[in-house]
């Protein structure tokens, strides 16, 4: 039997023996009001997808069809999305996407206290019901394409008990990640979580090796280390801060370079992975998609990114004036109506209306937004269902924008939400729950 056939058979067996846990309970506080009413993984991305669709699509494309989604903060819109768009796996074949919500009590004692605790609190159902041999743990809030079966194969081949996905990042950004050092066999020799002075890769003084928040564990080893960790004083119940250091101390921790399993390389061979955890990074990652050859190819059918297909009418474009520049370098989703308006370098989600003589430039406009006549929107993120009145100007005078809206830390991006606009218009702002 050839090596390629043996490898494919090994991968097939590995994925069948693996349970995926997607940690999707995070708020994403650096996104401010954009995640006030939705968890970060449920945030819209790329015109008609959600952030969690990337992790889920990677699973399906990798042959991993036994998936648990661990939820906590503002989970309603996420749960609706999963029920409407991800309920196609045949459970009679042992395939599923199950929701694992935090079982909060009145005293808050059973909220997930950290990433490791989120797995620990579900350990009984994992061990007794799902019974996996391997557990793949993913963050539900990153944008990337990866073949997880290759990571599983590397995990088994190295005789690791725990394997962490890693990626090279600029050293000045590495303080936001767990940073590691490895030997020639990719065995992790040092690991520090979010260091102030990140260590560099040997012979690459400006680059560090960072954790992607992706882990493969032998299931029995994970049960054991979680049981030991829960009784440890002063623990933060976190994989990066508590579990990985234990695995490092026990010399069973290995690294898997993302370059070995990345499925999203651009034409220059560069790998693509983004943490869209700030307003600037969320805006930039969406705007990047409008270029002719974006780093992330959302049209690649060899590794499709699935989602919840909404039933909308086709978009309509009315141009009755000769001096109006048509839509230019933009993504326009279904059900949009553009009337004598200029749209350039922008992403419009479903059912956006832009009225006459308005200009939308370098902006990300979420679903069901209405933009009135003679408006100028530049470098904006417009949240869902916002109504922009006629003659509104945003993104031209940053100091005026600071008084009315949320301006990003770099001063480049302006976030506009429904409550901000109502307050500006003198309307009473009440707490509302939207079916997002």
Curated annotation (Swiss-Prot):
Organism field? Histophilus somni (strain 2336) (Haemophilus somnus)
Sections of the chain in a coiled coil: none
**Protein name in the entry:** Glucose-1-phosphate adenylyltransferase
For the keyword Oxidoreductase, the answer is no
What is the gene name? Answer: glgC
Q: Which family does it belong to?
A: Belongs to the bacterial/plant glucose-1-phosphate adenylyltransferase family.
Q: Which InterPro entries match?
A: ADP-Glc_PPase (IPR011831), ADP_Glu_pyroP_CS (IPR005836), GlgC_bac (IPR023049), GlmU/GlgC-like_hexapep (IPR056818), NTP_transferase_dom (IPR005835), Nucleotide-diphossugar_trans (IPR029044), Trimer_LpxA-like_sf (IPR011004)
- Single biological process term from Gene Ontology: glycogen biosynthetic process
Quaternary organization? Homotetramer.
Do you know which HAMAP family this protein is assigned to?
GlgC
């Amino acid at each position: 039997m050839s090596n390629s056939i043996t490898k494919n058979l090994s991968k097939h067996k590995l994925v069948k023996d693996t349970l995926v846990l997607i940690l999707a309970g995070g708020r994403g506080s650096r996104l401010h009001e954009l995640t006030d009413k939705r968890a970060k993984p449920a945030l819209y991305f790329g015109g008609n997808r959600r952030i969690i669709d990337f992790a889920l699509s990677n699973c399906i494309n990798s042959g991993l069809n036994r998936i648990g989604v661990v939820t906590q903060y503002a989970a309603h819109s996420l749960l609706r999305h999963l029920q409407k768009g991800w309920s196609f796996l045949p459970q009679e074949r042992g395939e599923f996407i199950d929701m694992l919500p935090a079982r909060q009590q009145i005293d808050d004692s059973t909220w997930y206290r950290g990433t490791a605790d989120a797995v620990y609190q579900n350990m009984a159902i994992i061990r007794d019901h799902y019974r996996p041999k391997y557990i793949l743990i993913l963050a539900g809030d990153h944008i990337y394409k990866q073949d997880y079966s290759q990571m599983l194969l590397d995990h088994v081949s190295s005789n690791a008990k725990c394997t962490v996905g890693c990626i090279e990042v600029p050293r000045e950004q590495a303080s936001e990640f767990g940073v590691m050092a490895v030997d020639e066999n990719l065995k992790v020799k040092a690991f520090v979580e979010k260091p102030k002075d990140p260590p560099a890769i040997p012979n690459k003084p400006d680059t560090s090796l960072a954790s992607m928040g992706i882990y493969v564990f032998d299931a029995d080893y994970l049960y054991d280390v979680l049981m030991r960790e829960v009784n440890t004083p002063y623990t933060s119940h976190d994989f990066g801060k508590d579990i990985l250091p234990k695995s490092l101390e026990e010399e069973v921790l290995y690294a898997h370079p993302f370059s070995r399993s990345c499925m999203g390389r651009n034409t220059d061979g560069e790998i693509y992975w983004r943490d869209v955890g700030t307003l600037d990074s969320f805006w930039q990652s969406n705007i990047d998609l409008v270029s002719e050859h974006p780093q992330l190819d959302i049209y690649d059918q060899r590794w499709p990114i699935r989602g919840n297909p909404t039933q909308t009418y086709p978009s309509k474009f009315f141009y009755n004036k000769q001096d109006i520049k048509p839509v230019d370098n933009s993504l326009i989703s279904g059900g949009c109506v553009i009337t004598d308006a200029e749209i350039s370098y922008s992403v419009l989600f479903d059912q956006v209306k832009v009225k006459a003589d308005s200009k939308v430039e370098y902006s990300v406009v979420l679903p069901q937004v209405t933009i009135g006549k003679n408006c100028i929107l530049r470098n904006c993120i417009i949240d869902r269902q916002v109504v922009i009145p006629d003659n509104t100007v945003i993104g031209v005078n940053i100091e005026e924008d600071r008084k009315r809206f949320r301006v990003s830390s770099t001063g480049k991006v302006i976030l506009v939400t429904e409550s901000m606009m109502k307050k500006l218009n003198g309307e009473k702002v009440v707490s509302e729950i939207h079916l997002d």
